[in-house]
UniProtKB/Swiss-Prot annotation:
Top class in the EC scheme: transferase
Name of the molecule in the record: Queuine tRNA-ribosyltransferase
Organism (species): Parasynechococcus marenigrum (strain WH8102)
The keyword Zinc belongs to this UniProt entry's keyword annotation: yes
Subunit-level organization: Homodimer. Within each dimer, one monomer is responsible for RNA recognition and catalysis, while the other monomer binds to the replacement base PreQ1.
Similarity-based family: Belongs to the queuine tRNA-ribosyltransferase family.
Annotated region (RNA binding), positions in chain: 246-252, 270-274
Binding site residues for substrate: D92, S93, G94, G95, F96, D146, Q188, G215
Annotated residues for binding of Zn(2+): C303, C305, C308, H335
InterPro entries in UniProt: ArchSynthase1/Queuine_TRR, TGT, TGT-like_sf, tRNA_ribo_trans-like
Catalytic activity annotation: 7-aminomethyl-7-carbaguanine + guanosine(34) in tRNA = 7-aminomethyl-7-carbaguanosine(34) in tRNA + guanine
Biological processes per GO annotation: queuosine biosynthetic process; tRNA wobble guanine modification; tRNA-guanine transglycosylation
Pathway(s) served: tRNA modification; tRNA-queuosine biosynthesis
Amino acid sequence: MFGFEISAHCANTAARCGCFHTPHGPVHTPRFMPVGTLATVKGISTDQLARTGAQMVLSNTYHLHLQPGEEIVAAAGGLHGFMGWDGPMLTDSGGFQVFSLGDLNKIDDRGVVFRNPRDGRIIDMTPEHATQIQMALGADVAMAFDQCPPYPATENDVIDACRRTHAWLARCVEAHSRDNQALFGIVQGGCFPHLRRESARAVADFDLPGIAVGGVSVGEPVEEMHRIVRDVTPLLPTHKPRYLMGIGTLREMAVAVANGIDLFDCVLPTRLGRHGTALVGGERWNLRNARFRHDHTPLDPSCPCPTCSGGHTRAYLNHLIRSEELLGLTLLSLHNITHLLRFTTAMSQAIRDGCFSEDFAPWEPDSPAHHTW
Protein backbone atom coordinates (compact mmCIF):
# COMPACT_ATOMS: atom_id res chain seq x y z
CA MET A 1 0.00 0.00 0.00
CA PHE A 2 2.90 2.33 0.80
CA GLY A 3 6.25 2.22 -0.90
CA PHE A 4 9.03 4.45 -2.17
CA GLU A 5 10.91 3.77 -5.38
CA ILE A 6 13.96 5.75 -6.47
CA SER A 7 14.23 6.03 -10.24
CA ALA A 8 17.33 8.20 -10.69
CA HIS A 9 20.26 9.67 -8.76
CA CYS A 10 22.44 12.70 -9.41
CA ALA A 11 26.03 11.58 -9.94
CA ASN A 12 27.52 14.62 -8.19
CA THR A 13 25.09 15.29 -5.32
CA ALA A 14 22.71 13.34 -3.09
CA ALA A 15 19.70 14.42 -5.19
CA ARG A 16 17.33 11.66 -6.26
CA CYS A 17 13.94 11.43 -7.91
CA GLY A 18 11.39 8.77 -7.20
CA CYS A 19 7.79 7.89 -6.44
CA PHE A 20 6.05 7.60 -3.09
CA HIS A 21 3.05 5.28 -3.45
CA THR A 22 -0.03 5.99 -1.31
CA PRO A 23 -3.61 4.63 -1.24
CA HIS A 24 -4.76 7.74 -3.13
CA GLY A 25 -2.12 7.65 -5.82
CA PRO A 26 1.55 8.37 -6.46
CA VAL A 27 3.61 11.34 -5.35
CA HIS A 28 6.51 11.94 -7.72
CA THR A 29 9.53 13.36 -5.94
CA PRO A 30 11.06 15.81 -5.38
CA ARG A 31 7.71 17.49 -4.85
CA PHE A 32 6.26 20.59 -3.21
CA MET A 33 3.03 20.07 -1.24
CA PRO A 34 0.52 22.96 -1.09
CA VAL A 35 -0.83 23.68 2.38
CA GLY A 36 -4.57 23.45 2.99
CA THR A 37 -4.52 24.11 6.73
CA LEU A 38 -8.29 23.98 7.29
CA ALA A 39 -9.08 21.44 4.55
CA THR A 40 -8.77 24.18 1.94
CA VAL A 41 -5.87 25.83 0.17
CA LYS A 42 -6.96 29.39 0.90
CA GLY A 43 -9.13 30.86 -1.84
CA ILE A 44 -8.73 27.89 -4.19
CA SER A 45 -11.21 25.13 -5.06
CA THR A 46 -10.05 21.54 -5.37
CA ASP A 47 -10.72 21.62 -9.12
CA GLN A 48 -8.49 24.68 -9.46
CA LEU A 49 -5.85 23.08 -7.25
CA ALA A 50 -5.76 19.97 -9.45
CA ARG A 51 -5.00 22.17 -12.47
CA THR A 52 -1.79 23.40 -10.81
CA GLY A 53 -0.34 19.89 -10.93
CA ALA A 54 -0.52 19.40 -7.17
CA GLN A 55 -0.31 15.76 -6.09
CA MET A 56 -0.15 15.74 -2.29
CA VAL A 57 -1.87 18.34 -0.08
CA LEU A 58 -1.20 19.08 3.58
CA SER A 59 -3.78 19.86 6.28
CA ASN A 60 -3.32 20.63 9.96
CA THR A 61 -4.53 18.55 12.88
CA TYR A 62 -4.48 21.39 15.42
CA HIS A 63 -6.71 23.69 13.38
CA LEU A 64 -9.10 20.96 12.21
CA HIS A 65 -9.51 19.66 15.76
CA LEU A 66 -10.57 23.15 16.86
CA GLN A 67 -12.81 23.73 13.81
CA PRO A 68 -14.89 21.85 12.69
CA GLY A 69 -13.72 18.88 14.78
CA GLU A 70 -12.46 15.51 13.57
CA GLU A 71 -15.86 13.86 14.15
CA ILE A 72 -17.48 16.00 11.47
CA VAL A 73 -14.62 15.33 9.05
CA ALA A 74 -14.77 11.59 9.72
CA ALA A 75 -18.54 11.55 9.10
CA ALA A 76 -17.86 12.91 5.60
CA GLY A 77 -15.53 10.03 4.83
CA GLY A 78 -12.39 11.72 6.11
CA LEU A 79 -10.53 14.66 4.67
CA HIS A 80 -10.74 13.37 1.11
CA GLY A 81 -14.52 13.27 1.17
CA PHE A 82 -14.87 16.40 3.27
CA MET A 83 -12.92 18.65 0.90
CA GLY A 84 -13.49 16.72 -2.32
CA TRP A 85 -9.83 15.93 -2.99
CA ASP A 86 -9.06 12.47 -4.35
CA GLY A 87 -5.26 12.74 -4.32
CA PRO A 88 -2.79 11.95 -1.55
CA MET A 89 -2.97 13.96 1.68
CA LEU A 90 -0.78 14.50 4.74
CA THR A 91 -1.75 15.88 8.14
CA ASP A 92 0.72 17.67 10.37
CA SER A 93 0.31 16.58 13.98
CA GLY A 94 -0.30 20.11 15.22
CA GLY A 95 2.69 20.03 17.55
CA PHE A 96 4.23 23.16 16.04
CA GLN A 97 0.94 25.06 16.30
CA VAL A 98 0.34 23.96 19.90
CA PHE A 99 3.70 25.39 20.93
CA SER A 100 3.61 28.50 18.74
CA LEU A 101 -0.09 29.48 18.75
CA GLY A 102 -1.69 27.93 21.79
CA ASP A 103 -1.87 29.60 25.19
CA LEU A 104 0.19 26.93 26.96
CA ASN A 105 -0.83 26.06 30.49
CA LYS A 106 1.49 23.11 31.00
CA ILE A 107 3.92 20.86 29.17
CA ASP A 108 5.31 17.68 30.65
CA ASP A 109 6.23 14.19 29.54
CA ARG A 110 2.57 13.23 29.35
CA GLY A 111 1.68 15.90 26.79
CA VAL A 112 0.53 19.49 26.51
CA VAL A 113 -2.35 21.35 28.13
CA PHE A 114 -3.36 24.54 26.34
CA ARG A 115 -6.26 26.94 26.04
CA ASN A 116 -8.36 26.88 22.88
CA PRO A 117 -7.90 30.35 21.36
CA ARG A 118 -11.41 30.15 19.87
CA ASP A 119 -13.52 29.54 22.95
CA GLY A 120 -11.15 29.45 25.91
CA ARG A 121 -11.74 25.80 26.82
CA ILE A 122 -8.81 23.73 28.07
CA ILE A 123 -7.49 21.04 25.71
CA ASP A 124 -5.33 18.15 26.85
CA MET A 125 -3.22 17.07 23.85
CA THR A 126 -1.19 13.89 24.22
CA PRO A 127 0.60 11.85 21.55
CA GLU A 128 -2.26 9.35 21.71
CA HIS A 129 -4.88 12.07 21.27
CA ALA A 130 -3.03 13.65 18.33
CA THR A 131 -2.74 10.23 16.69
CA GLN A 132 -6.43 9.43 17.23
CA ILE A 133 -7.42 12.76 15.67
CA GLN A 134 -5.28 12.06 12.62
CA MET A 135 -6.69 8.57 12.22
CA ALA A 136 -10.17 10.11 12.23
CA LEU A 137 -9.11 12.71 9.66
CA GLY A 138 -7.91 9.85 7.47
CA ALA A 139 -5.07 11.40 5.48
CA ASP A 140 -2.64 9.07 3.72
CA VAL A 141 0.21 10.25 5.96
CA ALA A 142 0.01 11.24 9.63
CA MET A 143 2.85 12.99 11.44
CA ALA A 144 3.96 12.01 14.93
CA PHE A 145 3.29 14.48 17.73
CA ASP A 146 6.56 16.23 18.55
CA GLN A 147 7.98 19.12 20.53
CA CYS A 148 9.46 21.78 18.27
CA PRO A 149 11.82 23.97 20.30
CA PRO A 150 11.92 27.68 19.46
CA TYR A 151 14.92 29.52 18.10
CA PRO A 152 17.00 30.38 19.96
CA ALA A 153 16.81 27.75 22.70
CA THR A 154 19.30 26.53 25.27
CA GLU A 155 20.95 23.17 24.81
CA ASN A 156 19.19 21.81 27.89
CA ASP A 157 15.80 22.89 26.53
CA VAL A 158 16.53 21.21 23.20
CA ILE A 159 17.70 18.05 24.98
CA ASP A 160 14.36 17.92 26.80
CA ALA A 161 12.46 18.52 23.53
CA CYS A 162 14.33 15.69 21.80
CA ARG A 163 13.77 13.31 24.68
CA ARG A 164 10.04 14.07 24.64
CA THR A 165 9.86 13.87 20.85
CA HIS A 166 11.38 10.39 20.84
CA ALA A 167 9.26 9.16 23.76
CA TRP A 168 6.14 10.62 22.19
CA LEU A 169 7.00 8.96 18.88
CA ALA A 170 7.00 5.57 20.61
CA ARG A 171 3.55 6.35 22.02
CA CYS A 172 2.28 7.50 18.61
CA VAL A 173 3.47 4.23 17.08
CA GLU A 174 1.69 2.28 19.81
CA ALA A 175 -1.54 4.27 19.35
CA HIS A 176 -1.55 4.19 15.55
CA SER A 177 -3.68 1.37 14.13
CA ARG A 178 -4.90 2.55 10.73
CA ASP A 179 -3.45 0.26 8.05
CA ASN A 180 -4.19 2.61 5.15
CA GLN A 181 -2.34 5.49 6.79
CA ALA A 182 1.43 5.85 7.11
CA LEU A 183 2.96 7.39 10.23
CA PHE A 184 6.08 9.53 9.78
CA GLY A 185 8.49 10.42 12.59
CA ILE A 186 10.08 13.85 12.99
CA VAL A 187 13.74 14.64 13.64
CA GLN A 188 14.37 17.51 16.06
CA GLY A 189 17.52 18.83 17.72
CA GLY A 190 17.50 22.57 17.14
CA CYS A 191 20.80 23.99 15.93
CA PHE A 192 22.94 21.56 17.93
CA PRO A 193 24.66 19.13 15.50
CA HIS A 194 25.13 16.33 18.03
CA LEU A 195 21.46 16.50 19.07
CA ARG A 196 20.34 16.49 15.44
CA ARG A 197 22.43 13.39 14.76
CA GLU A 198 21.13 11.64 17.88
CA SER A 199 17.55 12.46 16.92
CA ALA A 200 18.03 11.27 13.34
CA ARG A 201 19.33 7.92 14.54
CA ALA A 202 16.60 7.57 17.16
CA VAL A 203 13.79 8.30 14.70
CA ALA A 204 15.31 6.08 12.00
CA ASP A 205 15.36 3.17 14.45
CA PHE A 206 11.53 3.14 14.49
CA ASP A 207 11.58 1.94 10.85
CA LEU A 208 8.55 4.01 9.81
CA PRO A 209 7.46 4.50 6.16
CA GLY A 210 8.99 8.00 6.06
CA ILE A 211 10.90 10.57 8.09
CA ALA A 212 10.59 14.34 8.38
CA VAL A 213 13.15 16.92 9.44
CA GLY A 214 11.37 19.45 11.64
CA GLY A 215 12.35 22.47 13.67
CA VAL A 216 13.69 24.44 10.70
CA SER A 217 12.51 27.78 9.34
CA VAL A 218 11.71 28.85 12.89
CA GLY A 219 13.98 31.90 12.89
CA GLU A 220 17.41 30.35 12.51
CA PRO A 221 19.83 31.77 9.87
CA VAL A 222 19.30 30.13 6.50
CA GLU A 223 22.89 28.88 6.52
CA GLU A 224 22.09 27.04 9.73
CA MET A 225 19.13 25.33 8.08
CA HIS A 226 21.41 24.24 5.21
CA ARG A 227 23.88 22.79 7.72
CA ILE A 228 21.12 20.91 9.54
CA VAL A 229 19.99 19.30 6.30
CA ARG A 230 23.57 18.39 5.34
CA ASP A 231 24.21 16.83 8.76
CA VAL A 232 20.94 14.95 9.16
CA THR A 233 20.05 13.57 5.73
CA PRO A 234 22.99 11.12 5.41
CA LEU A 235 21.79 9.45 8.62
CA LEU A 236 18.28 8.78 7.29
CA PRO A 237 17.29 5.59 5.46
CA THR A 238 17.88 5.93 1.72
CA HIS A 239 14.86 3.82 0.76
CA LYS A 240 12.24 6.02 2.45
CA PRO A 241 10.88 9.49 1.61
CA ARG A 242 12.47 12.42 3.44
CA TYR A 243 10.33 15.44 4.18
CA LEU A 244 11.70 18.89 5.10
CA MET A 245 8.92 20.67 6.94
CA GLY A 246 7.92 24.28 6.33
CA ILE A 247 10.29 25.06 3.44
CA GLY A 248 9.10 26.53 0.13
CA THR A 249 11.65 28.99 -1.28
CA LEU A 250 13.43 28.05 -4.49
CA ARG A 251 16.99 28.20 -3.23
CA GLU A 252 16.25 26.32 -0.03
CA MET A 253 14.40 23.57 -1.89
CA ALA A 254 17.26 23.22 -4.38
CA VAL A 255 19.87 23.02 -1.62
CA ALA A 256 17.74 20.47 0.24
CA VAL A 257 17.19 18.31 -2.86
CA ALA A 258 20.94 18.37 -3.50
CA ASN A 259 21.29 16.86 -0.03
CA GLY A 260 18.69 14.13 -0.58
CA ILE A 261 15.37 15.66 0.55
CA ASP A 262 12.22 14.56 -1.31
CA LEU A 263 9.19 16.49 0.01
CA PHE A 264 8.44 20.07 1.05
CA ASP A 265 5.49 22.13 2.28
CA CYS A 266 5.02 25.83 2.91
CA VAL A 267 2.27 28.45 3.10
CA LEU A 268 4.48 30.89 1.18
CA PRO A 269 2.82 30.76 -2.27
CA THR A 270 -0.69 31.45 -0.99
CA ARG A 271 0.44 33.93 1.66
CA LEU A 272 2.29 35.92 -0.99
CA GLY A 273 -0.70 35.67 -3.33
CA ARG A 274 -3.02 37.06 -0.68
CA HIS A 275 -0.69 40.05 -0.36
CA GLY A 276 -0.60 40.74 -4.10
CA THR A 277 2.81 39.20 -4.78
CA ALA A 278 3.68 36.86 -7.65
CA LEU A 279 6.65 34.51 -7.99
CA VAL A 280 8.19 35.01 -11.44
CA GLY A 281 11.60 33.80 -12.59
CA GLY A 282 13.10 33.65 -9.12
CA GLU A 283 11.79 37.11 -8.23
CA ARG A 284 8.85 38.44 -6.23
CA TRP A 285 6.68 40.94 -8.07
CA ASN A 286 4.34 43.26 -6.21
CA LEU A 287 1.38 43.45 -8.58
CA ARG A 288 0.20 46.65 -6.90
CA ASN A 289 3.16 48.41 -8.48
CA ALA A 290 2.24 51.11 -10.99
CA ARG A 291 4.62 49.62 -13.58
CA PHE A 292 2.08 46.85 -14.24
CA ARG A 293 -0.91 49.14 -14.75
CA HIS A 294 -0.55 49.33 -18.55
CA ASP A 295 1.21 45.96 -19.05
CA HIS A 296 -1.17 43.80 -21.09
CA THR A 297 1.09 40.75 -21.25
CA PRO A 298 0.63 37.48 -19.32
CA LEU A 299 2.18 37.31 -15.88
CA ASP A 300 4.62 34.62 -17.10
CA PRO A 301 4.22 33.63 -20.78
CA SER A 302 5.92 30.27 -20.14
CA CYS A 303 3.68 29.30 -17.21
CA PRO A 304 0.83 26.79 -17.78
CA CYS A 305 -1.11 27.80 -14.65
CA PRO A 306 -4.80 28.77 -14.92
CA THR A 307 -3.85 32.42 -14.43
CA CYS A 308 -1.23 32.70 -17.16
CA SER A 309 -2.78 30.25 -19.62
CA GLY A 310 -6.18 31.83 -19.03
CA GLY A 311 -5.06 35.11 -20.55
CA HIS A 312 -5.08 37.14 -17.33
CA THR A 313 -2.64 40.00 -17.86
CA ARG A 314 -0.40 41.90 -15.49
CA ALA A 315 -2.59 44.97 -15.95
CA TYR A 316 -5.71 42.98 -15.05
CA LEU A 317 -4.04 41.51 -11.97
CA ASN A 318 -2.86 44.98 -10.98
CA HIS A 319 -6.46 46.18 -11.26
CA LEU A 320 -7.82 43.27 -9.20
CA ILE A 321 -5.27 43.72 -6.42
CA ARG A 322 -5.71 47.49 -6.27
CA SER A 323 -9.48 47.01 -6.19
CA GLU A 324 -9.17 44.38 -3.43
CA GLU A 325 -11.09 41.88 -5.53
CA LEU A 326 -10.83 38.33 -4.16
CA LEU A 327 -10.29 36.95 -7.66
CA GLY A 328 -6.89 38.63 -7.77
CA LEU A 329 -5.73 36.79 -4.67
CA THR A 330 -6.95 33.48 -6.08
CA LEU A 331 -5.25 34.01 -9.44
CA LEU A 332 -1.93 34.92 -7.84
CA SER A 333 -2.12 31.98 -5.42
CA LEU A 334 -2.79 29.58 -8.30
CA HIS A 335 0.19 30.96 -10.19
CA ASN A 336 2.52 30.83 -7.17
CA ILE A 337 1.63 27.23 -6.33
CA THR A 338 2.17 26.22 -9.95
CA HIS A 339 5.50 28.05 -9.92
CA LEU A 340 6.83 25.99 -7.00
CA LEU A 341 5.45 22.76 -8.44
CA ARG A 342 7.13 23.50 -11.78
CA PHE A 343 10.39 24.14 -9.96
CA THR A 344 10.36 20.79 -8.16
CA THR A 345 9.31 19.05 -11.39
CA ALA A 346 12.21 20.72 -13.20
CA MET A 347 14.60 19.47 -10.53
CA SER A 348 13.26 15.95 -10.98
CA GLN A 349 13.73 16.16 -14.75
CA ALA A 350 17.25 17.54 -14.32
CA ILE A 351 18.16 14.60 -12.07
CA ARG A 352 16.90 12.18 -14.72
CA ASP A 353 18.73 14.07 -17.46
CA GLY A 354 21.99 14.14 -15.53
CA CYS A 355 22.24 17.93 -15.34
CA PHE A 356 20.99 18.69 -11.82
CA SER A 357 24.39 19.66 -10.43
CA GLU A 358 24.91 22.15 -13.26
CA ASP A 359 21.44 23.69 -13.13
CA PHE A 360 20.40 23.56 -9.50
CA ALA A 361 23.21 22.82 -7.05
CA PRO A 362 23.83 25.32 -5.68
CA TRP A 363 20.89 27.32 -7.01
CA GLU A 364 21.24 31.11 -6.97
CA PRO A 365 18.72 33.81 -8.03
CA ASP A 366 20.73 34.67 -11.17
CA SER A 367 21.38 31.06 -12.11
CA PRO A 368 20.93 29.96 -15.75
CA ALA A 369 18.61 27.29 -14.33
CA HIS A 370 15.79 29.81 -14.75
CA HIS A 371 15.19 28.80 -18.35
CA THR A 372 14.52 25.18 -17.35
CA TRP A 373 11.33 26.08 -15.45
